[in-house]
């Protein structure tokens, strides 16, 4: 059965019945006017007999009406618009085509708004699909299956996920909506509208219940592997991020976030501030969002796709200037101090003005949970310097080598601020004191070591 044709036919018949009854004409009177039987009119109005074009013209003439129609494009479940705010940027079709997978066909590009296009998207069919796939929840995120199960989706169903969440994110102000969608960004964006509490709980705990068909939730477009959830509070939006679990050395990531940001602050870096809190019985690091409806964050790896750290430094210099380069170098020195093993090309990047498309600044330093020897066992703290030799950066480059390659006078001055540094203890949640004291002692040795290395080699 073709429901689209049935619906159109039923709409026409409903209008004829409305007109007939509105004029006080009975089925028999209408039949007499057009020279047919009442039973024929009854069958047409009941949907038991198809309405021919000739019969439609006769009925309309008998009712004193004429037929007018336009050959409009049929609505399609596969037609979409990529928008920034309420501005259409690209009109496209998205279709799952069996073995070919998700296929995009670009129909129109807003050439007047090229400066506002996603910097990390190639404007081709394959480029759009790749961008959409990078936008939805990653397969390695904890509780990904539980999150998607809540909505009746699978992690391979990119189109289905986009249909449910409209591609809304807390990283930027893009969204993907059906063609001719009348809704306004102000009524749907995640910065100004309530979240789905159901999905936040599922994302953080792995437990929950079914949600509605459309959900205003950032969980479907948030990256990272740890359990996490965005929560909207009176004074802003906060990310709650738990730790790993299931092993003797698991669960220390929230502590590392809390302590590492103290080091960054002492050095004078532009950094995200972290606190600790228990939610649903799970310890989390919490931080306030650093994007907003007018400012987006783009991971550097989405823009600079080859060339490593040197290419990133060149990009910062070309797009943002020398001050931005110094900030990047300071972050890398900070990572060398705390032995950040997870500073990859997805957790540092740049901020962008959504209204103009111009880059404005480096993003603040964030995501330092896999640092300060969070995976170390108690016996490793008997000789942290020896244990540190087994740790490596995410770039597979020794931390000392990174430091020597990028440190300058500004970074050395920032290092000196750490002499005599100690952590501020949390009022409720802390690592064991002996572990924390050992890390403090190591930081002092590490700072002196790096200063000596710089003096010897510069």
Question: Where are these predicted regions, by residue range?
Answer:
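Short, basic-rich loop-to-helix N-cap that marks the start of a DNA-contacting helix
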Residues: 48-60
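N-terminal flexible/basic segments that precede or flank functional cores
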Residues: 1-18, 22, 59, 66
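Short C-terminal boundary/hinge segments that cap the last helix of small helical domains
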Residues: 64-74
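Short alpha-helical DNA-recognition segment
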Residues: 24-42
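Phosphate/dinucleotide-binding and metal-coordinating scaffold of catalytic cores
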Residues: 73-333, 337-339, 351-458
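Conserved protein-kinase catalytic-loop segment immediately C-terminal to the catalytic Asp
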Residues: 344, 349-351
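Helix-turn-helix DNA-binding elements, focusing on the entry/boundary residues of the two helices
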Residues: 16, 27, 38, 53-56
């Amino acid at each position: 059965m073709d429901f689209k044709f049935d619906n159109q036919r039923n709409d026409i018949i409903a209008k004829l019945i409305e007109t007939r009854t509105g004029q006080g004409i009975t089925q028999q009177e209408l039949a007499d006017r057009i020279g047919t039987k009442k039973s024929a009119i009854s069958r047409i109005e009941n949907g038991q007999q198809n309405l021919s074009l000739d019969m439609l013209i006769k009925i309309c003439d008998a009712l004193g009406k004429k037929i007018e129609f336009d050959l409009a494009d049929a609505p399609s479940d596969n037609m979409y618009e990529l928008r920034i705010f309420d501005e259409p940027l690209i009109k496209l079709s998205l279709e799952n085509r069996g073995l070919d997978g998700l296929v995009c066909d670009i129909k129109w590009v807003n050439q007047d708004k090229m400066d506002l296009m996603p910097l990390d998207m190639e404007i081709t069919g394959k480029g759009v699909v790749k961008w959409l796939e990078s936008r939805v929840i990653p397969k390695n995120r904890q509780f990904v299956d539980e999150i998607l199960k809540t909505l009746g989706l699978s992690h391979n169903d990119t189109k289905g996920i986009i249909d449910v969440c409209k591609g809304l994110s807390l990283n930027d102000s893009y969204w993907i909506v059906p063609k001719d969608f009348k809704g306004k960004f102000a009524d749907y964006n995640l910065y100004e509208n309530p979240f789905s509490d159901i999905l936040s709980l599922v994302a953080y705990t792995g437990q929950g219940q079914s949600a509605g068909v459309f959900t205003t939730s950032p969980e479907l477009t948030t990256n990272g592997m740890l359990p996490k959830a965005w929560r909207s509070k009176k004074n802003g939006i906060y990310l709650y991020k738990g730790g790993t679990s299931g092993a003797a050395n698991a669960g220390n990531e929230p502590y590392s976030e809390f302590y590492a940001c103290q080091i960054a602050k002492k050095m004078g870096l532009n950094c995200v501030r972290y606190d600790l809190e228990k939610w649903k019985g799970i310890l989390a690091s919490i931080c306030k969002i650093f994007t907003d409806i007018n400012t987006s964050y783009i991971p550097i790896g989405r823009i600079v796709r080859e060339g490593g750290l040197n290419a990133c430094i060149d990009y910062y210099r070309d797009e943002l200037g020398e001050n931005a380069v110094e900030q990047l170098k300071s972050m890398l020195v900070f990572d060398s101090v705390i032995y950040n093993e997870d500073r990859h090309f997805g957790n540092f990047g740049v901020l962008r003005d959504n209204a103009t498309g111009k880059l404005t600044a480096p993003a603040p330093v964030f995501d330092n949970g896999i640092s300060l020897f969070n995976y170390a066992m108690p016996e490793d703290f008997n000789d942290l310097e020896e244990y540190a030799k087994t740790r490596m950066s995410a770039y597979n480059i020794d931390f000392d080598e990174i430091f020597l390659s990028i440190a300058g006078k500004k970074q050395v001055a920032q290092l000196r601020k750490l002499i005599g540094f100690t952590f501020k203890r949390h009022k409720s949640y802390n690592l064991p004191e002996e572990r924390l004291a050992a890390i403090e002692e190591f930081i002092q040795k590490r700072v002196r070591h790096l200063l000596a290395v710089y003096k010897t080699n510069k």
